Amino acid sequence: MKRTYQPSKLVRKRRHGFRARMATVGGRRIIAARRARGRKKLSA
């Protein structure tokens, strides 16, 4: 059985990147929450 995590920079950026987050209302909330919390890294 193969492992579930098969790293890919492209898929990582497309799914969890900043622009992907900003594309939806829920994603915008995530970014806002991470900003409020003072996270150094907002997205992948």
UniProtKB/Swiss-Prot annotation:
Coiled coil: none
GO BP: any one term: translation
One cellular component term from this protein's GO annotations in UniProt: ribonucleoprotein complex
Database matches in PROSITE patterns: RIBOSOMAL_L34 (PS00784)
GO MF terms, alphabetically ordered: structural constituent of ribosome
Presence of the UniProt keyword Metal-binding in the record: no
InterPro entries in alphabetical order: Ribosomal_bL34 (IPR000271), Ribosomal_bL34_CS (IPR020939)
Gene3D superfamilies: 1.10.287.3980
Alphabetic keyword roster: Ribonucleoprotein, Ribosomal protein
Keyword Ribonucleoprotein assigned: yes
Disulphide bridges, residue numbers: none
Annotated family: Belongs to the bacterial ribosomal protein bL34 family.
Protein name (Swiss-Prot/TrEMBL): Large ribosomal subunit protein bL34
